[in-house]
Amino acid sequence: MSNMQQKTDVILIGAGIMSATLGSLLKELAPEWEIKVFEKLASAGEESSNEWNNAGTGHSALCELNYTSEKSDGSIDISKAVKVNEQFQLSRQFWAYLVKSKLIRNPQDFIMPLPHMSLVQGEKNVEFLKNRFEALSKNPLFQGMEFSDAPETLKKWLPLIMEGRTSNEPMAATKIDSGTDVNFGALTRMLFNYLKTKDVELNYKHSVENIKRTKNGLWEVKVHDMNSGKIEHHTAKFVFIGGGGGSLPLLQKTGIPESKHIGGFPVSGLFMVCKNQKVVEQHHAKVYGKAKVGAPPMSVPHLDTRYIDNKKALLFGPFAGFSPKFLKTGSNLDLIGSVKPNNVLTMLAAGVKEMGLTKYLIQQVMLSHEKRMEELREFIPNAKSEDWDIVVAGQRVQVIKDTDAGGKGTLQFGTEVVSAADGSIAALLGASPGASTAVHVMLEVLEKCFPSRMVEWEGKIKEMIPSYGISLTENPRLFQDLHTSTGRTLGLNEKETVHN
């Protein structure tokens, strides 16, 4: 047993994409700061950031229909889509800066150009997609998008999906070539390799057991060294909790007022993966459909080309499951252990409100392989059962909180930074769009936790991320310049997406 306190400037909990991004930003902005990372698993990027544990979509709202909603008058609200796209551009710029500065290399190992497509069936959905296309096409971030409801065009765009299709039901698709497939596991590992060269102390198989405030205002982190069995105590001026689903229980241990009245609802994900390489080669896009009526946003079905271990793969899903674990490697007691006196009413209210979600999850858990194949055949009519296996993806913990708009126990579907009033500690909660917006979210952490430093840091931030603080929607020329330059640096030689 060791009770010796070891001091440092910054502690990052969890070796996923969020800690990797924050650590990389801080090492560029304050290179003299000492940083320690604690990760329970044996290496970086093994939980939610791992390439098999998420969809690998560079979420920029090019194809995800849940980011555009239909108003009562039939018009399309694109505000959320624009926001998500703007946020992804920040990630793209930062990654390009890292590559150009030779801090990370071989961008093709973590990002590949890939068309993003939306596909719908039925007259009403075709009309919705056309209206969506027309609304987005007016925005410079989405120029280059094509729409078609012509069967011959759809056969060219989607040969695997259109082959063997017998229904005469109207279909339509949009296609944009500037989409990406991102291997967040590979990117996370690259970033931590870079941080290691900057003397960041990486501690794997180190589990954080407790976090408490010391009398002198520092944070003391109690760590179990799983290699030696020893208990260590580390103190820091600033702590970031980036432990994916494991962040909520650690945030609760801090006791900060901002951690109260927040709950978490774990949802597990399953994907079907194609093991017939001949089928894999017939598809080249991320194709997102429309969630069924009454299904939650997380259930949007998609058929994705992926690049994993430098090999082309084909995945379909997600299918939801239920597990009380907050992490894939977590405990069955995670959910019950997160219920506290200050959030029990919030959790109970959510339970009453979300009966539809509960019913949906139960139905999903009960699905047989053949029932899942039936859902896949809505995308690929000729899909054969023997060509597809199931892969268990990561756990996502949806935030439950009390809101003015939704009332007590409202389920949240985004990511959220929770920080202490004095900015000394912050945690990231939630799920989608997640890793794609890591740079935007970590800039938010910097703004919340280091407000007095932002003026000093602004010049360097803009060197790394030129559109920081600027709306690209309102600056189409800047968007075109940045899109072209980052595309060149990252090896994304897609068609030019902005037309004059």
UniProtKB/Swiss-Prot annotation:
Task: Please tell me which top-level EC class this enzyme sits in.
Answer: oxidoreductase
What EC number(s) does this enzyme carry? Answer: 1.1.5.4
Q: Which family is annotated?
A: Belongs to the MQO family.
Enzymatic reactions = (S)-malate + a quinone = a quinol + oxaloacetate
Name the record gives this protein: Probable malate:quinone oxidoreductase
Record keywords, A-Z: FAD, Flavoprotein, Oxidoreductase, Tricarboxylic acid cycle
Spell out the PANTHER family in the cross-references: L-2-HYDROXYGLUTARATE DEHYDROGENASE, MITOCHONDRIAL
InterPro entries listed in its UniProt record: FAD/NAD-bd_sf, MQO
Q: Does the keyword Lipid metabolism apply?
A: no
The pathway that the record names for this protein is:
Carbohydrate metabolism; tricarboxylic acid cycle; oxaloacetate from (S)-malate (quinone route): step 1/1
This entry's Gene Ontology molecular function terms read: 2-hydroxyglutarate dehydrogenase activity; L-malate dehydrogenase (quinone) activity
**Cofactors, names only:** FAD
Gene for this chain? mqo
In Gene Ontology terms, what is a biological process of this protein? Answer: tricarboxylic acid cycle
